[in-house]
Structure formats: structure tokens, C-alpha cells
A protein has these predicted regions:
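Basic/polar N-terminal segments that are highly enriched at the extreme N-terminus
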Residues: 1, 18-19
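Bacterial N-terminal signal peptides that target proteins for export
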Residues: 1-8
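Extended rod-forming repeat segments used as scaffolds/tethers
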Residues: 9-10, 37
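Short, linear, compositionally biased motifs with a strong N-terminal bias
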Residues: 10-11, 86
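N-terminal signal peptide c-region/cleavage motif recognized by signal peptidases
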Residues: 14-16
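N-terminal segment of the mature folded domain
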Residues: 20-148
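Short, compositionally biased segments
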Residues: 150-153
Length: 153
């Protein structure tokens, strides 16, 4: 083996020793399961390209409040992505994350927002187009149960 082959062998050996295997746990709420399955794959590939490290992201999903309670009670979450700031605040109040978490990243540390939509009957017979239309006589509003839906709060 020539000196280039020996050098390349040492370089490859050093690179494999320096690369890390990283495991993370993202504790999140139910509707984000599919989103994070895709996002985690993309992030892992990006991180590998940038650092050489292998990242495996495990997921735990459930109701936002239940997931907050799991973290408060000791589940070792590396990332928390919950439906409500209230649930993240509860974790911070118990000292599991920094109380100033909301100031850590742009947009109050919210990586995305939910879009509000109005679902109307076919043809929109009551001509509902904006928030003010919801208080017209004869218009009824149906919302999710705030006891079971993070989006309803």
C-alpha cells in the first residue's frame, strides 16, 4: 500500500471514530406524528451531511397535556413540541426546561402555526367569509372540545 493509501486509511478510521451516534426523543402531540416522521428523516440526513454524526430521532405522541405530564414526571425528552404554550409552561414551572423557553428562538419559539379554516355547507348558503360573519343570525359554530383538543384552547 502506498503512502496515499495509508493516509486515506487513517483518515477514514479517524472519521469513523469522530462521528457520533446521537439519539433524541421528541415528545409531541398526536396530530404531528406524520409531520415529524418526515421532518426527522430530513433533519437526520441534513445533520449527517453537516457533521458526519448519525441522528436517530424517536417519537412519543399523545394528547398535549398528557405529554406535558409525562415530561414533568420524568420522561427524558430532548425536544418538546406540544400544542399549547400552557403545557410547555407547566414543564418549565417544574424546572424541566428553562422558564425563558419562549424567548429562546424567533416567533416565541413556535416553529409553525395552525391555519384557521371555516368549513361551510356546499355553496356557502350563509355567505360566511370572515370572522364577523360568524355572528350573523342563523349561523352556528361548531368547535372541538377544549378538554380533548389542544387546538380548541
Amino acid at each position: 500500500m502506498n503512502k496515499w493509501g495509508v493516509g486515506l486509511t487513517f483518515l477514514l478510521a479517524a472519521t469513523s471514530v469522530m462521528a457520533k451516534d446521537i439519539q433524541l426523543l421528541n415528545v409531541s402531540y398526536d396530530p404531528t406524528r406524520e409531520l415529524y416522521e418526515q421532518y426527522n428523516k430530513a433533519f437526520s440526513a441534513h445533520w449527517k451531511q453537516q457533521t458526519g454524526d448519525n441522528v436517530v430521532i424517536r417519537q412519543s405522541h399523545g394528547g398535549s397535556g398528557k405529554q406535558a405530564t409525562s415530561v414533568i414526571n420524568g420522561i427524558e425528552a430532548d425536544v418538546v413540541t406540544l400544542a399549547l404554550a400552557y403545557d410547555v409552561d407547566a414543564i418549565a414551572e417544574r424546572g424541566r426546561i428553562d422558564k425563558e423557553w419562549i424567548k429562546r428562538l424567533p416567533d416565541n419559539s413556535a416553529p409553525y402555526t395552525s391555519t384557521i379554516v371555516f368549513l361551510v355547507r356546499k355553496g356557502n348558503p350563509k355567505q360566511i367569509h370572515d370572522w364577523n360573519d360568524l355572528i350573523k343570525p342563523g349561523v352556528s359554530v361548531i368547535t372541538p372540545n377544549p378538554k380533548s383538543s389542544g387546538g380548541a384552547r
